[in-house]
């Protein structure tokens, strides 16, 4: 019985490359001369540091541009609150979303059931497993999900026959 998984996870290699490129551009830009602006990456989160709110916005702008160039969907990013650190400096923690959330998983399963396509959807941890009897049905489910789900970047993997 053919099946596949619907997942929501960023390519962490591309995220790392985007962070490195952003830091390189920030270090060479004239408007950041003498400032301590940078982006750091730790496991599932990024931290943007800058001298003030305006420069923090500039740092995030550079990061988003580099991520877009590396084909990393910016919907993976979840921005935290801007925190003040020593003196005037500020930082912001940006979390990278991983996995299909419970609400989104339920919505995907409901959409699959409402579509009347002869497939079954089940939530398995942070992924949704879709299985059916025909490959064509699975392909039509993929097309439907790509068209209708816009709040999260979905990937389809683990195809089995």
From Swiss-Prot:
* Any one Gene Ontology molecular-function term assigned to this protein's record: nucleotide binding
Q: An example Gene Ontology cellular component term from the record? A: cytosol
Which InterPro entries is this protein grouped with? Answer: DUF520, UPF0234-like_C, UPF0234_N, YajQ-like_sf
> Which keywords describe this protein according to UniProt?
Nucleotide-binding
Classification via CDD domains: YajQ_like (cd11740)
Pfam families in the cross-refs: DUF520
| Family of this protein | Belongs to the YajQ family.
What is the annotated role of this protein in its UniProt record?
A: Nucleotide-binding protein.
Report the protein name in the record: Nucleotide-binding protein Reut_A2760
